[in-house]
Amino acid sequence: MMRLNWQIRQVQLLLERLGLQQLVWMDCLVMMLNKAIFLDRDGVINKRLIGDYVKKIEEFELLPNVREALIEFKKMGYLLIVVTNQQGSKQFLIFYNL
């Protein structure tokens, strides 16, 4: 349990250091046990398009510090899962790997 608490604190510190407190992720304990982080897409990991949503890779722009945070999370052994409720994802208009 002590090791788990240390890992949870490391995630919290990383988010604070990178200024990414707005990341949408599950309860820290559940996240640590399952080693997955769920991230919302538009406005959390990438720049939101006003009045629209990102449909093409050319429109996709990571927000500051996100790349570094994702790399650190991967190093810590997390599975990164990007979620979205954007209409295009249901219509299979959005296809790309980050």
From Swiss-Prot:
Gene Ontology biological process terms in this record: carbohydrate metabolic process
An MF annotation (GO) of this entry: phosphatase activity
Record SUPFAM superfamilies: HAD-like
Top-rank taxon: Archaea
Protein name: Uncharacterized protein MJ0015
Taxonomic source organism: Methanocaldococcus jannaschii (strain ATCC 43067 / DSM 2661 / JAL-1 / JCM 10045 / NBRC 100440)
InterPro entries reported in the protein's UniProt record: HAD-like_sf, HAD-SF_hydro_IIIA, HAD_sf, Heptose_bisP_phosphatase
